[in-house]
């Protein structure tokens, strides 16, 4: 009798873990789909072509930005992005980057919700950037 209860408890623990795992996977898929709708991923060449006529925003934290950033970029860290979103112009394209692209895509979703429509994210982020950089 005791062994049957143990199996029953383990079954429900397994079911709960499976549900949590499924929820996490579904959540990531939703974020991926929303981010693809919010921004276009661009490579270095496309980024370089338009960077002089756009707002370039580095969403890394300030210490990373100070260590080096794309020439002409300004820093709005992801942790403070919602607070400073009002300082971004809607009439100009917005080019976002970071180390990779996950946080930049999340910022793109925020911008899209605020009515921005020209949003781009640098493929590979700062790590893959081969253009001009500014080091402090």
What is the meaning of each model-derived region?
Residues 133-136:
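Active-site neighborhoods of enzymes that stabilize oxyanions during catalysis
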Residues 56, 73-75, 119-121:
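Conserved beta-strand scaffold positions in the cores of enzyme catalytic domains, especially
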Residues 82, 88-130:
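Catalytic cysteine-centered active loop of the rhodanese-like fold, especially the PTP/DSP P-loop
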Residues 63-95:
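Extracytoplasmic/periplasmic/luminal assembly and interaction segments
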Residues 51-55, 71, 90-92, 116:
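Short glycine/proline-enriched coil/turn segments at helix->beta-strand junctions
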Residues 43, 77-78, 123:
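Short loop/edge segments at beta-strand edges and connector loops
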Residues 1-67:
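Flexible, polar/low-complexity N-terminal or interdomain linker segments that lie immediately upstream
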